Amino acid sequence: MNPEAGSKGFASVNQAPAVKRLQVLTVNTHKGFTAFNRRFILPELREAVRSTQADIVFLQEVLGSHDRHAARYPGWPQTSQYEFLADSMWSDFAYGRNAVYPDGHHGNALLSKYPIIEHRNLDVSITGPERRGLLHCVLDVPGQHQVHAICVHLSLLESHRQKQLQLLRKLLESLPADAPVIIAGDFNDWKSHGNRTLGLQRDLHEAFERHHGHLARTYPARLPLLRLDRVYLRNAESHGPRILGHKPWSHLSDHLPLAVEVRL
């Protein structure tokens, strides 16, 4: 098995009733630390994520490994952070390693209650030291042909971000035209140029913008001003999008998570 994808036993989806709704959560984990790296809170984050009962969890800035942190912080997990968060609740997980450094590496991850039958990490790094990727997973959801999930964490630089959004658009154009697609994560798009670059059409929408008329404010977590995190859907409908802005969420990362019910 690919070491950067995981699966624990699951019942055959062919025997399961058709799934029409998926609970989706996206959260920038800030590598398991509070804002400004003041405190290691991965165990508390796991409990909060579990409490949402999400079917699919999109994670950004999650550590695959970090030797120095493992030696320094009591309670550091013996597994990768995404495996620790998945625990026994999400049977399948996939990881896209983006940034690699002497002590370890981090990237995006997807946790799923349904089988991940295929995944790939598309390198969308432009130039310089900043490494970015799009983690594309194909899910085997009962009653559906296939559901595509793309976990996103884009550049801090506007020029890089625009090129990465164009690559995301090309990825979307390569997928089956009628397939349900969920795109979620940290777009770092504080200028709100993403919709124009993606070329939103009737079959592609951003959940918060459709329901509330504007994108969600998610950063910084304690006093959210910037609209950085998004949930886009194609060939699926959104219902009840929420910003998880209360405690404990406001104290578990520098970003606030987003939760959306996706109707297939």
Feature map (PLM): residue ranges:
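Beta-strand-turn-beta hairpins that frame and shape the catalytic cleft
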Residues: V13-V24, H106-N108, S112-I117, E130-C151, ...
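Solvent-exposed loop/turn segments connecting transmembrane beta-strands
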Residues: P102-D103, T127-R131, E158-H160, W249-L252
